[in-house]
C-alpha cells in the first residue's frame, strides 16, 4: 500500500527507535526527509546523518543521540501539518515549542528551516512538525 504521509512515517520511525534505544534508524530517502534530518543534526537532536544510494530511492541513516545515563535527547516529536489538514503560520504567528526549548520545522518559500530562523528572516510557511 502506498504511504500517504512519508514525513509522519519518518518521525514515527525516529520516535520508535528512540523508545527502544536503537543507535540508528534507516528511512527511505526524499529531499524533504533529508532536509528535516539535517535540521535535527544542526539542532543537536541526532548525532549524524548518512545518505546511502542504492541506485533506486536511496536510504537516510540517522544515528540517534543519548545523554550520559542513556536518557533520550528527543523526548517528543509531533506532526502538525498533515495531508488531511494543512497548518500554515504567517510570519508573525510562527509558533514557539515549549517556550523556545523545542524546535518547530517550517516549510517556507526559502526551503525548510527552524522556527527561530523563520522569525529572523521574517518568513511564514507550513508548520511541518514540533520536536522537543
UniProtKB/Swiss-Prot annotation:
It comes from the Bacteria. SUPFAM superfamilies: Ribosomal protein S8. GO terms for cellular component: ribonucleoprotein complex; ribosome. GO terms for molecular function: rRNA binding; structural constituent of ribosome. Keywords: Ribonucleoprotein, Ribosomal protein, RNA-binding, rRNA-binding. Disulfide bonds: none annotated. GO terms for biological process: translation. PROSITE patterns: RIBOSOMAL_S8 (PS00053). InterPro entries: Ribosomal_uS8, Ribosomal_uS8_CS, Ribosomal_uS8_sf. NCBIfam families: PRK00136.1. PANTHER family: 40S RIBOSOMAL PROTEIN S15A. Part of the 30S ribosomal subunit. Contacts proteins S5 and S12. Belongs to the universal ribosomal protein uS8 family. One of the primary rRNA binding proteins, it binds directly to 16S rRNA central domain where it helps coordinate assembly of the platform of the 30S subunit. This is Small ribosomal subunit protein uS8. It comes from Desulfitobacterium hafniense (strain Y51). The gene is rpsH.
Amino acid at each position: 500500500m502506498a504511504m500517504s504521509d512519508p514525513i509522519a512515517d519518518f518521525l514515527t520511525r525516529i520516535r520508535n527507535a528512540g523508545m527502544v534505544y536503537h543507535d540508528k534508524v534507516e528511512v527511505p530517502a526524499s529531499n524533504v526527509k533529508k532536509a528535516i534530518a539535517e535540521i535535527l543534526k544542526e539542532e543537536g537532536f541526532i548525532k549524524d546523518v548518512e545518505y546511502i544510494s542504492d541506485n533506486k530511492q536511496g536510504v537516510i541513516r540517522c544515528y540517534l543521540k543519548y545523554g550520559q545515563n542513556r536518557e533520550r535527547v528527543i523526548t517528543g516529536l509531533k506532526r502538525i501539518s498533515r495531508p488531511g489538514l494543512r497548518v500554515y503560520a504567517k510570519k508573525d504567528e510562527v509558533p514557539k515549542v515549549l517556550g523556545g526549548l523545542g524546535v518547530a520545522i517550517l516549510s517556507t518559500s526559502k526551503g525548510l528551516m527552524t522556527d527561530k530562523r523563520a522569525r529572523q528572516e521574517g518568513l511564514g510557511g507550513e508548520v511541518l512538525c514540533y520536536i522537543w
